[in-house]
């Protein structure tokens, strides 16, 4: 069984959903990002979605786009991301590690090399947000060869054909979005019709469903679980907390001015989000 299989089986037995934070690697530096990741896990995060910084993050709203920029200002590279994943994997051998990476990275490195490198570093899954499932066959094949779970996005208003394709191609979990647009709490998740979104995906008997985009409060998490999702992913709300503790102006590197304060704020937020995954 994969780490995702183990996680979802354990949570199902416990009557809980998964809470998965998105955290940008190297934001604002590798060492500080590792402390942030460790804090998230210790606060109750069930799995991780880690971002690799990119200069043109088209699927991300302003908050997460700024985290890409902070990481790049600090000198982040794909190679440094791989080293950070190795460190996280060594520290947390059982925690599923998902990656969010833009599609030019595998093209630049070569598909087979790309997936093999991330598998060897300790990643469990990779989501390429700018690669739709209809273009995913070569990525899925390279992922399978490396032992990586490919993840695809199930858009809120997708056709049945698209949802069937996403369900067939996604391994580990399915990333379902609660509304159209880019990531971020600039537009919060709408819980209207959420059960229908989840039910439409479940018809195709795919991997567990994690709901993302605009998930910023415990109520959003509770609504996702009540709608039948297996968990929720939160990115922009966490990134905002990190940004509120950063100092520095682009293009100069940033730093965390109060790591203890950041850890406290993250722990309070993540603990509340995780508590909301309890099924009633």
From Swiss-Prot:
Q: In which pathway does it act?
A: Amino-acid biosynthesis; L-tryptophan biosynthesis; L-tryptophan from chorismate: step 5/5
Q: Gene3D superfamilies annotated for this entry?
A: Aldolase class I
InterPro entries tied to this protein: Aldolase_TIM, RibuloseP-bd_barrel, Trp_synthase_alpha_AS, Trp_synthase_suA
Reactions performed catalytically? (1S,2R)-1-C-(indol-3-yl)glycerol 3-phosphate + L-serine = D-glyceraldehyde 3-phosphate + L-tryptophan + H2O
What start-end ranges are recorded for coiled-coil regions in this protein? none
SUPFAM superfamilies this protein is in? Answer: Ribulose-phoshate binding barrel (SSF51366)
One Pfam family named in its UniProt record: Trp_syntA
GO CC terms, sorted: cytosol
* Transmembrane regions: none
Protein keywords: Amino-acid biosynthesis, Aromatic amino acid biosynthesis, Lyase, Tryptophan biosynthesis
EC code: 4.2.1.20
Q: How does it assemble?
A: Tetramer of two alpha and two beta chains.
Please state which protein family the record places this protein in.
Belongs to the TrpA family.
**PANTHER family, per this entry?**
TRYPTOPHAN SYNTHASE ALPHA CHAIN, CHLOROPLASTIC (PTHR43406:SF1), TRYPTOPHAN SYNTHASE, ALPHA CHAIN (PTHR43406)
Purpose: The alpha subunit is responsible for the aldol cleavage of indoleglycerol phosphate to indole and glyceraldehyde 3-phosphate.
Listed name of the protein: Tryptophan synthase alpha chain
Q: Which organism is it from?
A: Corynebacterium glutamicum (strain ATCC 13032 / DSM 20300 / JCM 1318 / BCRC 11384 / CCUG 27702 / LMG 3730 / NBRC 12168 / NCIMB 10025 / NRRL B-2784 / 534)
């Amino acid at each position: 069984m994969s780490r995702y299989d183990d996680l979802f089986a354990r949570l199902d037995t416990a009557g809980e959903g998964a809470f998965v934070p998105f955290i940008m690697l190297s934001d604002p530096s590798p060492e500080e990002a590792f402390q942030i990741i460790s804090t998230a896990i210790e606060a109750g995060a069930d799995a991780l979605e880690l971002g690799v910084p990119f200069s043109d993050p088209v699927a991300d709203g302003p908050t997460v786009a700024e985290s890409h920029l902070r990481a790049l200002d600090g000198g982040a590279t794909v190679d440094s991301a791989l080293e950070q994943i190795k460190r996280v994997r060594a520290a947390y051998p059982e925690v599923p590690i998902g990656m969010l990476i833009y599609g030019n990275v595998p093209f630049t490195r070569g598909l087979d090399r790309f997936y093999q490198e991330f598998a060897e570093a300790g990643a469990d899954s990779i989501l390429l947000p700018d690669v739709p499932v209809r273009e995913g066959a070569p990525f899925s094949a390279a992922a399978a060869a490396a032992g990586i779970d490919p993840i695809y996005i199930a858009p809120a208003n997708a056709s049945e054909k698209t949802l069937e394709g996403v369900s067939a191609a996604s391994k580990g979990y399915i990333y379902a979005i609660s509304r159209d647009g880019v990531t971020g709490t600039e537009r919060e998740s709408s819980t209207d019709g959420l059960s229908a979104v989840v039910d439409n995906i479940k018809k195709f008997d795919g991997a567990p469903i994690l709901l993302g985009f605009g998930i910023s409060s415990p109520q959003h998490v509770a609504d996702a679980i009540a709608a039948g999702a297996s968990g929720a992913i939160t990115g922009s709300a966490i990134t905002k907390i990190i940004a509120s503790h950063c100092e520095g102006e682009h293009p100069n590197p940033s730093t965390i001015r109060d790591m203890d304060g950041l850890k406290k704020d993250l722990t309070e937020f993540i603990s509340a989000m995780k508590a909301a995954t309890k099924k009633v």
